[in-house]
A protein has these predicted regions:
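Residue(s) in the substrate-gating loop at a strand-loop-helix junction
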Residues: 183
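C-terminal helical subdomain
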Residues: 7-34, 226, 246-360
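Active-site loop-to-helix junction immediately N-terminal to the catalytic Tyr of the SDR YXXXK motif
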Residues: 143, 189-197, 209
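Active-site helix of classical SDR
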Residues: 163, 199
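Conserved glycine-rich Rossmann-like NAD(P)H-binding loop of the short-chain dehydrogenase/reductase
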Residues: 69-85
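Substrate-binding pocket helix/loop in short-chain dehydrogenase/reductase
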Residues: 139-152
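Conserved glycine-rich cofactor-binding loop
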Residues: 48, 55-56
Length: 360
């Protein structure tokens, strides 16, 4: 890709600028050439891959995509088993093995039993995909606390449990990949979806924090990612059906905005997320995107072409906060060092440095 704002053919930029140039990656709502299944056929041969929430639209697509890559699939479900045809489809696509395990990821005991069973039967785990999710929707002040807590348990506690249980294994084998299916809801505020937004935001930051610890230990072959899987139509996103069932009656303008955002804009293929996850699991982007939050709608090839731009800006593909006046997240203003304001105040008053009750 070329253009006035694209990186040069050498991958360098003008040294007089403070940051490398950027260009907008191409956007997709379906599988595109860089992540075509045929490019990754057998790329994850015999890699033991746990996929939670495998019964849903996103989970089944993940299973099929990793099957093409030759993975050994451990597909978990809680209340609803995956369709009986899923195993046959995955085997026909190239999966080394397919097994189904009932597991409630919201409970630590269930996660412990799952990890123990997989390690005993398969001898290892190579890839963990935390895909199970819950979104009960509802007004914050009337939603039953049990529903809010359940969303946190499934969306955050489950991934935490499984990551916590498997990280020692990944460290001992010096390899492993975690793909946490988050959501754009983790980076924006959406009414009637408080528990979902809060838990997905926490999941994004959990991923980044754990990767930082792994990087300190120079375990570069243990790589984690959080992802927005795209706008995929599912029971969770068809608000035109859900809002009335939940007895939610927002103002007409709000209802209209929700209907358009969820029912019209949700037109992405679940295989876009599936093949992006396969590509990331192979490690082709770990030097740039490990620990990062990735929107699968952006062209991965275009993202990787801007590795230096991403490495030079910690806010890219990460949660961050912006303040007026350039205030940094550490609490100091642009160009100031911690304590500068205190020192100036103390010097002006002719007193010693320190905080004193200001009086009234």
């Amino acid at each position: 890709m070329s253009g006035p704002s694209s990186p040069s053919s050498t991958g360098h930029w003008d040294s007089t600028t403070t940051k490398p140039p950027q260009f907008a990656p191409r956007s997709h709502n379906d599988v595109y050439p860089f992540i075509l299944p045929k490019r990754f056929r057998g790329a994850l041969k015999d890699k033991v891959t746990i996929i939670t929430g495998s019964a849903g639209t996103i989970g089944q697509a993940l299973a099929e995509c990793f099957a093409v890559a030759g993975a050994k699939l451990v597909l978990t479900y809680n209340n609803t088993p995956p369709p009986t045809t899923l195993k046959e489809r995955c085997v026909n696509l190239g999966a080394s093995d397919v097994s189904f395990v009932k597991c409630n990821v919201a409970e630590l005991k269930g996660c412990e039993d799952l990890v123990k069973q997989v390690l005993q039967t398969q001898g290892k785990v190579d890839i963990l995909i935390n895909n199970a999710g819950a979104n009960s929707l509802g007004l914050f002040d009337t939603q039953p606390p049990e529903a809010f807590i359940h969303e946190l348990a499934v969306n955050l506690h489950g991934p935490y449990y499984l990551m916590r249980l498997l990280l020692p294994h990944f460290k001992s084998q010096h390899s492993g990949c975690v793909l946490n299916i988050a959501s754009r809801a983790g980076t924006v505020a959406i009414p009637y979806s408080t528990g979902y937004c809060a838990s997905k935001a926490a999941l994004i930051n959990l991923t980044a924090c754990v990767q930082k610890e792994l990087d300190v230990d120079k375990l570069n072959d243990v790589h984690l990612y959080s992802l927005h899987p795209g706008g995929i139509k599912s029971v969770m996103t068809l608000t035109s059906q859900i809002l009335p069932l939940l007895n939610l009656h927002p103002p007409p303008s709000t209802h209209s905005a929700f209907t358009q955002a969820f029912d019209t804009l949700y037109d992405d293929s679940p295989y876009l997320n599936g093949m992006t996850c396969v590509a990331l699991a192979t490690g082709l982007a770990k030097h740039v995107l490990r620990g990062k939050y990735v929107d699968v709608g952006q062209d991965l090839e275009d993202i990787l072409a801007q590795a230096e731009a991403i490495k030079s800006d910690e806010n890219l593909y990460a949660l961050h906060t912006s303040f007026l006046g350039g205030l940094e997240n550490g609490g100091t203003g642009a160009g100031e060092k911690p304590g500068d304001g205190l020192k100036k105040s103390a010097e002006a008053e002719g007193g010693k440095e320190g905080f004193e009750f200001p009086g009234f």
